[in-house]
Amino acid sequence: MCLYRRCFGQEKPAAPIDNRNRIIEKMGFFSLFSRNKTVEQADAEKADLERGLDKTKESVLKKITRAVAGKSSIDEEVLDNLEEVLVTSDVGVETTLEIIERIQERVKRDKYLGTAELNKVLREEICALLVESPQEDPWQQEGKTPYVIMVVGVNGVGKTTTIGKLAYKFKQSGAKVVLGAADTFRAAAVEQLQEWGRRTEVPVVAQAMGSDPASVAFDTLKSAVAKEADVVIIDTAGRLHNKIGLMNELTKIKNVMKKVVPEAPHEILLVLDASTGQNAIEQARQFTAATEVNALALTKLDGTAKGGVAIGISHQFNIPIKYIGVGEKISDLQLFNKISFVESLFGE
């Protein structure tokens, strides 16, 4: 038995496995941004996703091939080897143990499962673990106009770039968008967001360097309401050196926004850099402790072999991944679809 299962135990009952085949076959995409998508656009996005995950896929499939070499059945040795593959692919120990337990249950139930079916079983079990993202158009829900997204994350993860690309996607889908530059501690952050505003022709509300971030958020929502905007996206400072300070700052921003839009923010989007692997999980831990994160965006998947971290983060924190960055182009921020992701990552 592998070290991880010896240390953490394997007596915990496996999660229910009912409807797994139905889950893997369900191809529910977000309707947002995809309602008017052509077949050519969908194919192009799929190709971009596969290219973006090339490094992770190549690494993982090589390891799986070695794990089952010379084996025809899924035995304890194969599971030990697979466990090592997943942990070293940045899936994380906790999530890896869950996946292995699920596969053990499948082997017990389907007595004739062999290594030839391992990849398919692995895809199904990982897909069943990933948290499903909402399917509705959030900004078109009754009583949620403007729909307010507060974006959080440390400096350097691609937070402001993600906001710019997200604004572009919302605008392409027909929404009227307003951006708020509430990261007032870095002049570069405000300037970068203003540049994205110019590129996407979306208005940006900003104040002087060092201004109160909550004041910027307040002005942004007032402006959005006056403009009858559909979506507001608020950038925030990315500092983790003081969790209490971070918590207080984000709480203040939320409370001030509620004075203008009582339900705001409707979404708190945490941006994480997939290339940092397990560091991304630690950032998720700190931000989820500081505020009520309810959506994730993973950037830089195209430049790393650590794409497996997406599986661990979504499962460990029970938060859906909504967006993934798979390239430099403005259109390379994609809606996350767990089936497409898993098929691109583990497909043969």
Regions found by a protein language model. Give the residues of each.
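Non-catalytic terminal/linker segments enriched in charged/polar, low-complexity residues
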Residues: 1-138, 142-151, 172, 176-178, ...
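P-loop/Walker A NTP-binding module and the surrounding RecA-like catalytic core of P-loop NTPases
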Residues: 94, 127, 132-348
